Amino acid sequence: MALPCSPLRLPVRFAIAGFVALAAACNDSTGPQARLSDPQGLSSDLQAVDGAFQSSTFQSFSALSFAPGSPVAAPSRMGALLAAAPIVPPRARTQPYASAPARLQALRLAASVLSSGISANVIPPTMYGQTWVWDEGTHQYILSPDPGPNNGIRIILYAIDPITGQIVEPPVAVGYVEFLDWSTPSTDSLQVILRGGTPSVPGTTYADYAVSATVTGDPPTAFSATAGGFVSDGTRTLTFGATFAVTQVDTDNPDTQIDVMWDIDNPVIHVELHETLAQSDADHLALTLTEFSITRGAETVSMHGTITSVLSTEAFSINLVVDVNDVPWIRIRGTQNGATVRHPNGSDLSPEEGQAFLDLFFLSATIEFAVLNLFTPAGSFMGA
C-alpha cells in the first residue's frame, strides 16, 4: 500500500470515507510497533460477518420505510425512540465524527418528542391487533382482516427486487415483523421481532431486539435510552447491548455518553464502544473515543483518541491510535485537508495488514448499513 506521502486534497464528504483507504504508508515517525498475529485470518473473519445480514427476510424488512402504504412510513413517538438508540456498530470508527452530529440530533429530537411525558404506549392503541399485507391491485400495503398481536402490529414481508429495493409483483411472502409495545407510565419501550415463515407457522427468528427510553424534566433536561437483542441469518448471530445518555438537552450544546457491546458467534468476535460527545457551543463538537475494540481469540485490536469538528464548515481534526493488545499498531492523524495512516515507527503496512485494516473499517460500515435497516422502518413509524 505504498502511496505518495502527501496530504489528500479531497472534499470533506469524500475525505471522510476515503482517507482511510488511501493514506496508508508514509514514513515520518518512530515508536514501538505491534503486528497483527494473523491479518489474513482477521480479514476472513470480518468478511464472514456480512452473512448475519443477508437473509431475504432481513432484506425485505429493510424496505418497509419506502414501501407505499407501509404503516411504518408515518412519523410518531416510536421513530424518535428508535433513532435515539441505534444498535449500529460504528463504522469501526473510520470516521466516528461523521455520525456524531446526527446522533446528537437524534437524541435531542427524541427527548423533545417524548418531552410531553412518558406515555403508557408508543404505538397508538387504535393500531393494536392490526396486520398489514401487500395489495397487488393498488400496489401498496393495506390493512388486513387477519388479527395481529394484542399489544402491537404485524407487517407481512415480501421478496424485493435487489436492485430497486421495491416489492416484486406478484408478491411472494418471505416472513413478517411484529412491533410490540411494552411501555409503562415511566418508560417507553418497543420490541421488534423479525421472523421467517408465517404467523401460523413461524420460521427462523432473524432479529429480536428492544429499545426503551426515559426522559427527565418537561421541557426535558436529560434523556437516556437502552437497546438490546440480536440479529441472525439462521447460522451467524450478532447480539448487542447499548446505553445512551444525554444531558443539557434543553440547550444548544448537549453532552452525550455512549456505551455499546456486540458479540458475533461465528466467527467469535467481541466489539466494544465507549465514547463521549461534548459541545462547547452549537457549532463545535468534541468526540473522545475512550475505546473502540475488536477482540478475536487472544488478540484485541482497539482504537482510542479524539476528534474535534466545526459542524457548520465540516472542518475536523483527528488524532487516533490503533493498538494490538495495548501496543500501538497504527496512527491516524490529520484534518479535513488530509490525513495519514501509518505504523508508529514509520514503516509501511504490509499488503495483508492493509487489507485487514480496510476490512476492519469497511466491513463494519456494511454492518452499520445493515443494522440501520433494523431501525429505519420502525424509526419512520415512530417519528424519527
Please give the residue ranges for each predicted region.
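Bacterial N-terminal signal peptides that target proteins for export
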Residues: A2-A15
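Processing junctions and N-termini across compartments
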Residues: A17-V20
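Long, acidic/polar, low-complexity amphipathic helices and coiled-coil-like
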Residues: L109-G234
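Generic "edge-of-domain/loop-turn" microfeature
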Residues: T164, T184, P199, P267, ...
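Edge beta-strand at a domain terminus
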Residues: T205-T214, T243-F244, F375, A384
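Intrinsically disordered, low-complexity segments enriched in Gly and acidic/Ser/Thr residues
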Residues: T237-E353
